[in-house]
A protein has these predicted regions:
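Outer-membrane beta-barrel "beta-signal"
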Residues: 146-148, 181-195
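Outer-membrane beta-barrel translocator domains and adjoining extracellular loop/strand segments
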Residues: 42-54, 83-91, 118-132, 163-172
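Cleavable N-terminal export/targeting peptides
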Residues: 1-32, 195
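Short glycine/proline- and aromatic-enriched beta-strand/turn motifs that initiate or cap beta-hairpins
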Residues: 25-85
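Hydrophobic, lipid-facing positions within transmembrane beta-strands of outer-membrane proteins
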Residues: 57-63, 92-96, 136-140, 183-189
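Outer-membrane beta-barrel translocator/channel fold
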Residues: 80, 111-135, 152-162, 182-185
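Transmembrane beta-strands of outer-membrane beta-barrel proteins
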Residues: 32-41, 74-78, 109-113, 152-158, ...
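Repeated loop/turn-to-beta-strand initiation elements of outer-membrane beta-barrel proteins
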Residues: 69-75, 105-110, 146-153, 195
Length: 195
């Protein structure tokens, strides 16, 4: 089972517009430095006509700085591993996230992430690699008071495209015809220090 990224995107766009139009929902002049662990086993990996929703594992981490006006940004790194058509796939992406937070000790955050760098590997005897990745992510977080800061948790939905894949053997370069498309959902759990 996986979430439809297009539907999530529409939902987040609607909520974001409501929040940005309303200036009465400031973040109560609290700055936050947040650290997250990302983990999930839901998703869909597609390579041409071959699709799998089984044995998908995503792990990662994120650091996020939220200013007193509610705007935030930070990097997020994720690695997804699966087996597709008897081939081992490793998909790594480095993303830049931006967000908007409302509330004080109890908070709500909506955010968007964009893939900036990454690497994909396909292994099954031969090894195909790519350093090209594009895609985006949406996330929603809730925060509650906890020891000089906050506990923060929520969901992140990501869609990334890796490719073109190629290998070089005996000076000859071979390229795969189709890219790999990864759609995954992760839990985001972390701690935020208030300042």
């Amino acid at each position: 089972m996986y979430f439809d990224i297009t539907s999530l995107r529409r939902f987040f766009l609607f909520i974001s517009l409501v929040l940005f139009i309303s200036t009465s929902y400031a973040a109560d002049d609290i700055g936050r430095l947040r650290y997250f662990i990302l983990s999930g086993d839901q998703g869909k990996i597609t390579h041409g006509t071959i699709v799998t929703e089984d044995s998908i594992k995503t792990q990662g981490a994120s650091i996020h700085l939220v200013f007193a006006n509610g705007m935030g940004f930070g990097p997020a790194m994720m690695t997804t591993k699966t087996t597709l058509n008897s081939q081992s796939h490793t998909l790594y992406s480095e993303n830049i996230d931006v967000s908007y937070t409302i509330g004080g000790e109890w908070s709500f955050t909506l955010g968007y992430g964009r893939a900036m760098n990454g690497r994909g590997e396909i292994k099954n005897g031969d090894e195909y690699v790519t350093s090209s990745v594009k895609g985006d992510a949406l996330f929603m977080l809730f925060g509650m008071p906890f020891v000089f800061g906050e506990l923060v948790g929520g969901l992140r939905g990501s869609k990334h495209e890796f490719g073109p894949y190629q290998k070089t053997e005996n000076g000859t370069e071979t390229q795969l015809e189709q890219n790999i498309i990864s759609q995954t959902v992760q839990m985001m759990l972390g701690y935020g220090l208030h300042f």
